[in-house]
């Protein structure tokens, strides 16, 4: 059941960002090539917010998903990058610039019983002392990457850790 048709601008931006993503999971690029031939489920977008030491990630406690990066559904008229930025602002009050290349592209279901769709993960780095404002009912917290967290997406921990290591290499840290 397709809940909303994804507009052409969003799909075109998703194709470009999927190609530019640092990491690909679940055969996402091939899935997108096939899925764009017909109506698609709404796209998902999230932001992996790292502290400047790349030792922590900012997570939001979702009511049934557990601890997850800030994110959500890409709204009509938005690109995935715009949707990720909007969700980050709504859920944390933060409005940093996202890094140029998306962190990852994956295929997943964001709700039990819903079909899978494309999810794009973007990244940013902010000072851990930067104040944030949590959305009502969704606490926000810095979480150390050397510790785990409860989430309905168990692969996220390793994926986010790998991206932090990749960023550290790009920044000349080891």
Regions found by a protein language model. Name each.
Residues 2-46:
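Acidic, metal-coordinating catalytic segment for phosphate/diphosphate chemistry
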Residues 29, 37-66:
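A glycine-rich, hydrophobic loop/mini-helix early in the fold
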Residues 68-72:
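A short gly/proline-enriched turn/hairpin at secondary-structure junctions
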Residues 74-161:
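Unchanged
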């Amino acid at each position: 059941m397709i809940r909303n048709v994804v507009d052409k601008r969003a799909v075109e931006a998703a194709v470009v960002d999927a190609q530019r993503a640092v990491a690909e999971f679940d055969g996402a690029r091939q899935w997108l090539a096939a899925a764009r031939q017909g109506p698609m489920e709404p796209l998902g977008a999230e932001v992996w917010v790292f502290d400047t030491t790349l030792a922590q990630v900012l997570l939001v406690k979702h009511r049934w998903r557990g601890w997850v990066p800030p994110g959500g559904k890409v709204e009509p008229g938005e690109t995935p990058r715009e949707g990720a930025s909007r969700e980050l602002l709504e859920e944390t009050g933060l409005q940093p610039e996202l890094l140029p290349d998306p962190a990852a592209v994956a295929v997943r279901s964001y709700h039990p019983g819903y079909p899978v769709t494309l999810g794009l993960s973007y990244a940013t780095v902010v000072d851990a002392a930067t104040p944030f404002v949590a959305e009502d009912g969704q606490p926000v917290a810095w979480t150390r990457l050397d510790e785990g967290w409860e989430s309905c997406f168990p692969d996220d921990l390793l994926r986010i850790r790998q991206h932090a290591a990749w960023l550290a290499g790009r920044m000349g840290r080891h």
